[in-house]
Amino acid sequence: MQEYPIIDADAHVVEAVAGIRKFLKEEYQARPIWTNHSWDMDFGGTLGKHNDKPEVQLADMDAEGINTQVIFPSRGLSLNFEKQTQLAVNVARAYNDWLAEFCSVNPQRLKGVALVALQDVDAAIKEARRAVEELGHAAIMLPTNVKDQDIGRREFWPFYEEVERLGVALALHDGTRMAERMHGRFETFISVHTVAFPFECMTALTGLMFAGVPEVFPGLRFAALEAGCGWVPYLVDRMDEEFAKRGSREAPLLKLKPSDYFHRGQFYITFELEERMLPYVIERLGADKLLFSSDYPHWDTEWPNAVKAFLSREDVSQADKRLILCDNPQRFYGFSADCKSV
């Protein structure tokens, strides 16, 4: 019997279009839900497992040995790139309703992450409140940019204020369409996928930090997901260096060094299972900042061997493995998991 519950801090569901459509307002019923497309559409055998049924999700969690899974969208990852604002607002609401229905099959094990359309900040505030207080979602997904705008901008601060009041985590997750500038530069998906997620997370965290968001809203918790972890010590060092030289003029709201906001527990990160930089990141930032992610059911997941692959690593201590698999995600997301759920 496993000694502690294993929590997957970043998994996905492939949205059921028909299921979401039934929650849309009538004027959107006949329209395409996802007007953005993504790369990697024609590579046979690389698209992962398309699952939109909670019973299958739970069975696959059992196969992996996962007690609780925090569930993000797939197509919806790029919602905040949608140019039709009202469509994005309505799709976010419908998706959250559908996801609540999906998770209701076993709410102890299936934890939904709500979508909001930050193209309309007032609507995003209302939807965040509804998603948490009425639907019971565990966190809110934060895009790395909103139509290529810095998410640290003051126009988004009322949203951060409301999320801090709600007491839930903000999970920073990129989608391949969010890094639009990469698509004009590269001709292959492999190039975009290699750099888009870490570079977008670096950009987003830099914007949040120097805008003063972690200082102004000290109750907020952020996680940078699915972007690896090796770049984080570099970024933290570089932000500290820049802050020492220019912070008083260009980041006057920060009362601490950027690294201090990481060390005090406002920022968490996931890692790639085979990432060789992981021990160094643990040494520099601490194992208490790391979260385990299977990325199920996407094409690059290690399912059903993700947990086994991590537990087999000899360069991470047993105590740190427990932190990463169990204690950290409960602290970040603010829920309790139970071994008995499997």
Regions found by a protein language model. Give the residues of each.
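Helix-coil boundary/capping segments in enzymes
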Residues: 1-342
